[in-house]
Amino acid sequence: MLKLRIASTDMQFLQWVEQFWYPNASTAQLETLNTLYPSTLAQGSPFNTGNLNGITPQYKRIAAYQGDVIFDAPRRFFQEALSGKQNLWGFLSKRLKGVPYLGSYHGSDLNPVYSQNYSELKDALIYFTNNLDPNGKTVPGWPQYSKATPYMLTLYDGIPATNITQDTFRTEGVQFLTSLAIEFPL
């Protein structure tokens, strides 16, 4: 809920990013960030929920930025760096986006692990623990992640409950955040 107090205008968002994330960023870099992470509700997180869950004008924008800068950009950077050096698998949860007001939230991907309704991750965790491979007879085919083929097991509410997708969402924004992290390490 901290996002409610961070910013209510585009200028406040950019001031917050500059003050707390990139105090040495150029105006051009901040303008690029402003373009890649717009305040348009339909383009914010949780994604693919339209204007739902837009508690404030900047809420979904800040959620998209924070999700990418804290989770997706570092994850993708390390998965690409380790590609071809060790076995990798990735997953994306698109479950629980219908939670009123907030949509999916940090940690919501863990609920299905302990649910009777979904067993994919639970079974995959057991297979991985025993075999260093999440694939098994009760898990949908889960191809390895590589830089050339960044496959992810994507989890959905409803049917189908899973699908294999590519880890190519928001590529330009995630790559830009990675370049900022390298240039301005925290």
Language model features with spans:
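Substrate-gating cap/lid region and adjacent catalytic-acid/histidine neighborhood
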Residues: 1-118
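Alpha/beta-hydrolase-fold serine-hydrolase catalytic core, especially in secreted/extracellular enzymes
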Residues: 83-86, 120-186
